[in-house]
């Protein structure tokens, strides 16, 4: 597990978290098995990606006036959750004075091609917890982190089967995005594991899409 040296952030990165064949098998399963939906934002336009939210009972939360209610875990996501928990460095919690608590929800994003994206944002909702782990499957897409001044702190196409963990004050000090890349024709799935802290108590945050 590599540590990305960015002042004010705490980031762990494993480029080869899943073997290629296993990552491809999981990608194909989730592509057809997840209950994908293309939601509309509070401003009535379609969010430019498909989403599926799975989690323990009570892990609902609200983002941009849209409530996410968890679907029941499917076996493949439960199995992956256990592996991601095992790979998450305990120091990610101890640096914050916390005991390891694992993940109780996952937001799955499907980018069907390079026209799908997620705008610059921070996962800074108080109920989301400070440690967020992301598994990438499928087409490599640019993942970019920017500081408060807009300066790029990290920019890399995350590989198929990679694990990227943001912890510490990363969400407070930085925003991240997956910009549009019209030349990308193939789909990408991103699985973002979280620990919902205040279960069942939604917030009302506006986000970029």
Task: For each feature predicted by the language model, list its residue ranges.
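Non-heme Fe(II) oxygenase metal-center motifs and adjacent flexible, charged/small-residue loops
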Residues: 1-209
């Amino acid at each position: 597990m590599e540590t990305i040296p960015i002042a004010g952030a705490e980031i762990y990165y494993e480029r080869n978290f899943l073997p290629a064949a296993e990552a491809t098998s999981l990608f194909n399963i989730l592509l057809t098995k997840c209950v994908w939906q293309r939601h509309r934002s509070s401003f009535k336009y379609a969010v430019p990606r498909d989403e599926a939210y799975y989690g323990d009972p009570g892990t609902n939360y609200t983002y941009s006036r849209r409530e996410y209610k968890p679907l029941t875990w499917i076996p493949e996501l439960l199995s992956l959750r256990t592996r991601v928990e095992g790979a998450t460095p305990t120091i990610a919690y101890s640096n914050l004075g916390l005991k390891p608590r694992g993940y109780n929800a996952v937001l799955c994003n499907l980018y069907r091609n390079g026209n799908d994206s997620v705008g610059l944002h921070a996962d800074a909702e108080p109920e989301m917890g400070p440690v967020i782990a992301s598994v990438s499957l499928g087409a490599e897409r640019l993942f970019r982190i920017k500081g408060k001044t807009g300066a790029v702190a990290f920019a890399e196409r995350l590989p198929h089967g990679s694990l990227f963990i943001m912890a510490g004050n990363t969400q407070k000090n930085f925003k991240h995005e997956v910009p549009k890349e019209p030349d990308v024709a193939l789909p990408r799935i991103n699985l973002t594991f979280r620990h919902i802290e205040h279960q069942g108590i939604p917030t009302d945050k506006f986000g970029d899409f």
